[in-house]
Structures are given as C-alpha cells and as structure tokens.
From Swiss-Prot:
<keyword id="KW-1133">Transmembrane helix</keyword>
<dbReference type="InterPro" id="IPR001466">
    <property type="entry name" value="Beta-lactam-related"/>
</dbReference>
<feature type="transmembrane region" description="Helical">
    <location>
        <begin position="471"/>
        <end position="491"/>
    </location>
</feature>
<comment type="function">
    <text>Its precise function is unknown. Has no penicillin-binding activity and is not involved in methicillin resistance.</text>
</comment>
<keyword id="KW-0812">Transmembrane</keyword>
<dbReference type="Pfam" id="PF00144">
    <property type="entry name" value="Beta-lactamase"/>
</dbReference>
<feature type="transmembrane region" description="Helical">
    <location>
        <begin position="389"/>
        <end position="409"/>
    </location>
</feature>
<protein>
    <recommendedName>
        <fullName>Protein flp</fullName>
    </recommendedName>
</protein>
<feature type="transmembrane region" description="Helical">
    <location>
        <begin position="433"/>
        <end position="453"/>
    </location>
</feature>
<dbReference type="GO" id="GO:0005886">
    <property type="term" value="C:plasma membrane"/>
</dbReference>
<feature type="transmembrane region" description="Helical">
    <location>
        <begin position="6"/>
        <end position="26"/>
    </location>
</feature>
<dbReference type="InterPro" id="IPR050491">
    <property type="entry name" value="Bact_CellWall_Synth/Modif"/>
</dbReference>
<keyword id="KW-0472">Membrane</keyword>
<keyword id="KW-1003">Cell membrane</keyword>
<dbReference type="InterPro" id="IPR012338">
    <property type="entry name" value="Beta-lactam/transpept-like"/>
</dbReference>
Length: 498
C-alpha cells in the first residue's frame, strides 16, 4: 500500500470515528419529554458528585418550578458523628441570604411611609457619623441597600467584639467616625455592615427588635414557622452541625460570631421553610407583587463580581440570564439561592460546610433545569444505544492496540537499522495537516456538550453520562491521537532496501 493511500485511509478513519460519536450524541427526536424518574436520577447523580468533590458532610436542596416542588431532599448528614441524616427540615445558617429578608423589610417600611430610601442614616440612627478624606459624609438608606455607602468590607474585627458590645444596638459604636473607602454613592463595595445598619434602622423605626419584626412581618405570614436567628452555638434537634475542612476531612467547627451581624448573616432555616419564601419570590400575592419586583431591581453596578451585573435589595442580579441570586458563606456553613422569575423556577442549596462546590452545584442544577427536556431526550436516547457504544469502545480499543503494536514494531525496526527517516516539504505539509485535523476534531469533541446540550462543562456532563458512553469517548480520544502517531510514522519513515 502506498504512503498516499495509507494517509487518506488513516484520515478517513479519524473522520468516521468523530462522525460516529457525533451521530450517536446528536440523535434527537422531536418527542416531547417531561421530568421523569430518569431526570430525578440525573439530578441525584449531579448533586452527589459535587457534594463528594467538595467533601461536604450534608446538604439540603430545594428546586421549585412553576409553583410546584420538583425536589426537596437531604443528602449526607446534618450530624456526622451521630449519623443524623440531612433532610428538608434540617436547619442551616444561611449567612448572607439573610440580606434579602432585611432588604425586603426596608422596602416595605418605605412603602408604608415609615421611612424614605433617600433618608440619611443619621435620621434613624442618632449620632451616626462617618468620614471621607477627613470630612463628614451623609449616607442614605438607599446607599446601604445598594452596597454603595463606602463602608469598607473589613471595617470590624472579630477581636473587637466582646460580650459587652455584641448587640445590634452596639453596631454604630464599632464604626463611629471611621473612614470610608470612597465617597457614598460612587462605587459598589460589598459589606455586611450596610445590612447590619439596615437592621438597626428597622429596629429603631418599628420600635421592636429586628428579629421580632422580621418574624411577625414575614416569617409567620409565610408559614416559615421553624425559621429563627442564631443567638448561641447551642444546637437543637433539627440544627445542622457546622464543619470546616482539615485537609479533606470535615471537622466540627464552632466559630465566634457577632450578634450585630444578625440582619446580614445569621438567619437559620430549612429548605422546608424556604419553599414558602421561593414561591413568594417567584409568584407573590398581588398586594406584594410590586414590592418583590422592586427588591429585584438593580440599584448599583457590580463591576468585577462574577456572573453578576448589579446589586439589588439583598440580591445580586444577572440581567443577561434573568437571574436573581445570592450566595452565603460562613466559616462552617454555605448557602446559595437562585431565582429565575422569567422562567418561574428557583434553586436552594444549603450545606454545613463552607465550600466552593455549593455555587458550582447550583450552576449545574440550573443548567439541568434549563435544558432538562433536551437532557432527558438525549439521556433516554443514549441509554437505547448502549450496545452500539460498547461496539465503538471495542473498535477504538482495537485501533489503539493496533497503533501501539505498529508503533512498537516501527521502533524495533529503527533500532535494528531497518527504517530510515525521510524528509521533504510534501511530508512536512501532510504532517502539519494531519496534526491540524486531529486538533480540530479534538476541539469539536470538547465542544460537543455546548453544541448539543448547552453546557460547556465536561465535568458536569460526565456526572450523568452512562459509563458505556464515557468509555466510548475516552477510547475514541485516545484512538484519535494514536492514529495521528501512526500517520506521522508512515510519513516520516521508510523501510530500507536490503
């Protein structure tokens, strides 16, 4: 067989391999699908994969779509030592997801005429004063909501908090007269202190404690009867134990905390209770519709914040994808709430570990929900073609073995002087062309999740793909580059005449 024929035969094999994989993955009928047991299994697989990767002891996860609960389930343990499993009733510290309650309460008080968003903070918090470049500056309630007050994110230290000043009323004493990072209203800077001050304003305007007002005005009407606010490190029956990682091992953690951070960080709740909150946010009663919509409106631009265009009243927003969301992190807990009012669904992940895998999990679940019809159809189709993928795996494995045998034989021939290297411009061009074709096909393979499923994340796709498809993909990729090696050996070597 001539070199030219061998070259085109090898290229044909590569193209046919790539096309066969593309055909198997892209076969997609017009059959309408809905969320089925297979979809539930896919979601469970995604969740368990991310929790395992993040070494998260326990989590409770809620998905609400079109006013109905699709998923409300616990995974792992709320208490590892006692083997108490996480459940929808497990209570977690939700950290900064407390801010949305505080923001909504402020907007409600403004709607009732009990305060104005353009009021100076000092109007409701007597003697409040902060400086910029040595000059006293006026900060408004709206600037606190928008995180544009200029108050630094690191303005207080845990070391400065004692049992004597660890109350919401003491928050102003900790920062009184301190220097702002920038002039109020000019720049976004995320700071818990903004929402702590809003909590104090709520307290002063309503003449009742912040926690009592939130409970009576929002929690009870929404039937969030098991939601509370952290007061001590004592854990009741349904409270999750918080953990921190030591290496890859979660260990019990009970960090110190500030009571004055209650309005910004220390609500304790469950997915069972948050079901009511999510439904309220997505489909509020008529009397609250304008209020909820206002709480989702952009107040400030958040340049530099990942995946966010702006900050609203206790929420980040992404206008491009119509998302309203917020993460919450403490030393030993993390949470993430995502809303898509346009498509009418919400996702909640509560975990008893501070982990970067919590927002990753929400991203994966969001992708799954947005594309669930496509995923369900593709997954169903792939399951029907498992035998064919097994055949592909066998063929690709055979091709890899043949390529290995040929390469080893060529190496043996070279060692014994039976092979000579040849060089020419034509061979160089063909070599570069072969390499470019292989790279192009590899890039197409890499882009398949985005082209077919709307996700550019292979790690996400691989969590729910059947093992037969995974093996077919892996062996195909190896076969692709094995074939390239064979092509290059054909082009650059020739058998010596004896």
């Amino acid at each position: 067989m001539t070199t030219k024929k061998l070259y085109f035969l090898s290229i044909s094999i590569i193209i046919l391999v790539a096309i066969s994989i593309a055909i198997y993955i892209t076969l997609n009928s017009n059959t309408k699908t809905r969320l089925t047991n297979d979809s539930q299994q896919q979601i469970d697989t995604i969740i368990e994969h991310d929790l395992q990767k993040g070494h998260i002891p326990g989590a409770s996860i809620l998905i609400v779509k079109n006013g109905k609960v699709f998923l409300n389930k616990g995974y792992g343990y709320q208490d590892v030592d006692k083997k108490v499993k996480a459940s929808p009733t497990t209570k977690y510290e939700i950290a900064s997801n407390t801010k949305a309650f505080t923001g909504l309460a402020i907007l409600k008080l403004a709607q009732e005429g009990r305060l104005n968003l353009n009021d100076a903070v000092s109007k409701h918090v007597p003697h409040f004063k902060m400086n910029y470049n040595g000059q006293n500056e006026t900060i408004t309630i709206k600037q606190l909501l928008a995180q544009t007050s200029g108050i630094p994110s690191d303005i207080t230290s845990e070391d400065s908090v004692t049992s004597k000043n660890n109350r919401l009323n003491d928050v102003t004493h900790a920062i009184m007269g301190d220097e702002l990072h920038h002039k109020p209203g000019e720049e976004f800077e995320y700071s818990n202190m903004n929402y702590d001050l809003l909590g104090l304003i709520i307290q002063n305007v309503t003449k009742q404690s912040y926690t009592k007002y939130i409970t009576n005005s929002w929690l009870k009407p929404l039937h969030m009867t098991h939601t509370s606010f952290k007061q001590t490190n004592y854990k009741s029956k349904h409270d999750a134990i918080g953990y921190e990682l030591q290496g890859s091992t979660p260990v019990v953690s009970k960090p110190e905390f500030n009571l004055w951070d209650t309005p910004s960080a220390y609500m304790m709740t469950s997915t069972e209770d948050l079901e009511h909150w999510i439904k309220f946010q997505l489909n509020p009663p008529d009397k609250y519709k304008s209020l909820v919509q206002q709480s989702h409106k952009n107040l400030s631009s958040t340049i530099g914040e990942p995946n966010a265009n702006a900050y609203a009243s206790g929420w980040f927003t992404n206008n491009d994808e119509h998302l309203v969301f917020h993460s919450g992190t403490l030393d030993n807990f993390s949470s993430f709430i995502l809303l898509n009012p346009k498509q009418n669904y919400g996702i909640v992940v509560l975990a008893n570990l501070n982990s970067e895998y919590v927002p990753k999990l929400v991203e994966h679940l969001n992708t799954q929900i947005v594309n669930h019809k496509r995923y369900s159809t593709v997954a169903s189709m792939l399951n029907q073609y498992k035998d064919q993928f097994n055949i592909v795996t066998v063929l690709m494995t055979t091709l890899i073995l043949l390529a290995f045998i040929f390469s080893a034989y060529r190496a043996w021939q070279m060692r014994h002087g039976q092979i000579l290297l040849r060089r020419s411009k034509r061979i160089a061009v063909l070599s570069w062309l072969s390499l470019c074709i292989c790279i192009a096909l590899a890039l197409i393979l890499y882009a398949l999740p985005y082209l077919i499923l709307g996700s550019n994340n292979w790690s996400f796709v691989l969590t729910w793909l059947p093992i037969e498809i995974k093996l077919a993909l892996i062996t195909t990729l190896i076969a692709l580059f094995s074939t390239l090696i064979v092509i290059l050996l054909f082009l650059h070597t020739k058998i010596t005449k004896t």
